[in-house]
Amino acid sequence: MLMLELKDICFERANKKILNHINLVLEKNKFYVITGPNGSGKSTLAKIIMGIEKPDSGQIIFEGKDITNLSVDERAKLGFGFAFQQPVHFKGITVFDLLKLAVGLEIQEEDALRLLKKVGITSKEYLKREINRSLSGGELKRIEIATVLARNPYIAIFDEPEAGIDLWSFQSLTEVFREIESTSNGITLVISHQERILNIADQIILLEKGQIKQIGDREEMVKTIFKDSSHVEEENYE
C-alpha cells in the first residue's frame, strides 16, 4: 500500500529552519489533512511534495523511486496535482481553455461545466471569462481546484482550499472532498484549519514549529486538536 514517503526532510529559508527532520509515509486510498499553527511549515511541506520547493536534505520516494530532484512538470507527469492558496492569473486564457489544458483532451462545454459545478460555479458564462483580475479571489480559487480535479491525479494537494470562498461554495467543496475521500485510488492531501475538512480526513497530521508533533486517525486527532483551539479556525467566509 506504500505510495509516497518523505525521509528526514529539512528545509531552511534565510537561516531559519522551516521544516526539521520530517518523516512521513502516505498510503494509497487515503485522505490526509495537514494542520497546525500559522508558520508551522504546512504550505512549505506541500510545496516540497509537489516539487515547487526543494528540500535542503532528505529524500522523497514515490512508489519506490527517488523523485527528490524531479521538477514540478516531471512530477505532474507522474500524476501529482497542486492547488495554490493564492491562485495565479493567466492573461488571455479563458476558463474553458484552462480546463481543456488540465484535462489534456478536447472536451465539450458540458464536461467543463460539470467540473465547475463541483466547486460551486454553475453559470455557463464563466467558461468565456479570462483568468485575470476580473475574477474574485474566491472564483479564481474554485477554478483552480476544478483544474486539479480535471486531471484526476494520483496525488492531489490542496493548500487551504477554503481560503477566499463563501459559505455556499465551501459547503459544495466539502461534498467534493467527501466524494474524493470515498472514491479516490490515490492520495488526497489538504492543508486546512477548518473543522469540517478535518472531519473528512482518514488521517490528520499535526505540524508545529516545522516538525510533526502528532499523526493519527481522525477520531483520535480531532479530540487532541480541539483541546488546543489555536490549531483550528472559526469558519468565516466572504
Q: For each predicted feature, which ranges?
A:
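Conserved structural motif at the start of ABC-family nucleotide-binding domains
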Residues: 4, 18-21
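Helix-to-loop junction immediately C-terminal to a conserved catalytic motif
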Residues: 50
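Conserved ABC transporter NBD signature motif
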Residues: 58-65, 111
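Q-loop/switch helix immediately C-terminal to the Walker
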Residues: 86, 92-108
